[in-house]
UniProtKB/Swiss-Prot annotation:
Subunit description: Homodimer.
EC number assigned by the record: 4.1.1.37
Main subcellular location: cytoplasm
Family: Belongs to the uroporphyrinogen decarboxylase family.
Superkingdom of the organism of origin: Eukaryota
Protein's organism: Danio rerio
GO MF annotations, alphabetized: uroporphyrinogen decarboxylase activity
Catalysis performed (reactions): uroporphyrinogen III + 4 H(+) = coproporphyrinogen III + 4 CO2; uroporphyrinogen I + 4 H(+) = coproporphyrinogen I + 4 CO2
Name of protein: Uroporphyrinogen decarboxylase
Residues that, per the record, bind coproporphyrinogen III: R39, A41, R43, D88, Y166, S221, H341
Keyword Cytoplasm: yes
GO biological-process terms attached to the record: heme biosynthetic process; porphyrin-containing compound catabolic process; porphyrin-containing compound metabolic process; protoporphyrinogen IX biosynthetic process
Pathway: Porphyrin-containing compound metabolism; protoporphyrin-IX biosynthesis; coproporphyrinogen-III from 5-aminolevulinate: step 4/4
Pfam families: URO-D (PF01208)
Length: 369
């Protein structure tokens, strides 16, 4: 029998009590700098490992109750200013008809990756996200109710190039050479696949907003293997298309606009372009200097990031000092503190707490000046 929670409707949500994250995303006044972490619902938490023990990863992703619980776990420990729904970027290729398995110690694996352009015929041409990915929407709606207005809930997706790379490589890759071979050898087929992915992603993000997501993040995790020319041809146009189309559809649906974040990891060369792409927030990794990022984006967007996650292996004192420098570099306006990548499984939860505390404390000092 289905849990009654599965039938909870995306309306009458509890009132939001802490909207600091949403205000910072829009560049509005704040009392403290908001902070959250990519992969804050993750294996570094003993309770997360306990909840996940012995369960198939994607089976967990398909359980709204499990996703809700995992999303809420970090909020019980730390005063984060936002939650991000527990899910995975690879649910999109699954919805398009590809099989993905999570192999312990190896990560996500596609038993039958796309090898040549004719393999595109294996993908569904029409994807009904509301039937294929309804479990994500249900998880978002359930979590919005269970979070009781404590903080906003972020929905997310992988970006087209990042998903294309997984679908061709068959998993993670150091060089992405199989996927990049397509860009150089089969540019037309590459654009066809990227367009197909974009269409599904737009509907998927709209569905997340309808379900209750209060912000959206688009993860372009594999920007670093592209040069500036390839980025401008195979990544940027699709990132822009997603933001514009999602915003148009939100408007058409009579829903309130939600802030959108684009995170193109290692895409320094694209910073100016990304700041003119209809996203309210640009996420940064730790290889960019905060002050130069401010200059290069010219106040057009809010910024999110960008502490090296490995700084969390240091002492609480060093974490506090690194956070102070980071905040002084970014300034307090239009800024969301985060890491420049996700939390790693072997990190000490105590140090994650120290990071959050340092952001809140230092930002209150800065705002008094």
């Amino acid at each position: 029998m289905m849990d009654k929670d599965s039938f909870i409707l995306p309306k009458d949500f509890p009132e939001l009590r802490n909207d600091t994250f949403l205000r910072a995303a829009r560049g509005e006044e704040i009392e403290h700098i908001p902070v959250w972490c990519m992969r804050q619902a993750g294996r570094y938490l003993p309770e997360f490992r306990e909840s996940r023990a012995g369960k198939d990863f994607f089976e967990t992703c398909r359980s709204p109750e499990a996703c809700c619980e995992l999303t809420l776990q970090p909020l019980r420990r730390f005063p984060f200013d936002a939650a991000i729904i527990f899910s995975d970027i690879l649910v999109v290729p699954q919805a398009m008809g590809m099989e993905v398995q999570m192999c312990p110690g190896k990560g996500p694996t596609f038993p039958e990756p796309l090898k040549e352009p004719e393999d595109l015929q294996r993908l569904k041409t029409q994807v009904d996200v509301y039937s294929e990915l309804d479990y994500v929407f249900k998880a978002i709606t359930l979590t919005r109710h269970k979070i009781e207005g404590k903080v906003p809930l972020i929905g997310f997706t992988g970006a087209p190039w990042t998903l294309m790379s997984y679908m061709i490589e068959g998993g993670g890759s150091a060089t992405h050479s199989k996927a990049k071979r397509w860009l150089y050898r089969y540019p037309e087929a590459s654009h066809k696949l990227l367009s197909q992915l974009t269409d599904v992603i737009v509907e998927y993000l709209l569905g997340q907003v309808k379900a209750g997501a209060q912000a959206l993040q688009v993860f372009e995790s594999h920007t670093g293997c592209l040069g500036p020319v390839e980025f401008k041809e195979f990544s940027l146009p699709y990132l822009r298309d997603i933001a514009r189309r999602v915003k148009d559809k939100i408007k058409e649906s009579g829903l309130d606009n939600v802030p959108m974040i684009v995170f193109a990891k290692d895409g320094h060369y694209g910073l100016e372009d990304l700041s003119e792409s209809a996203y309210e927030v640009v996420g940064l990794d730790w290889t960019i200097d905060p002050r130069s990022a401010r200059v290069r984006t010219g106040g057009k967007v809010s910024l999110q990031g960008n502490m090296d996650p490995c700084a969390l292996y240091g002492t609480k004192e060093s974490i506090s000092e690194i956070v102070r420098r980071m905040l002084e570099g970014f300034g307090t306006k239009g800024y969301i503190a985060n890491l420049g990548h996700g939390l790693y499984p072997d990190m000490d939860p105590e140090n994650v707490g120290a990071f959050v505390e340092a952001v809140h404390n230092h930002s209150r000092q800065l705002l008094k000046r």
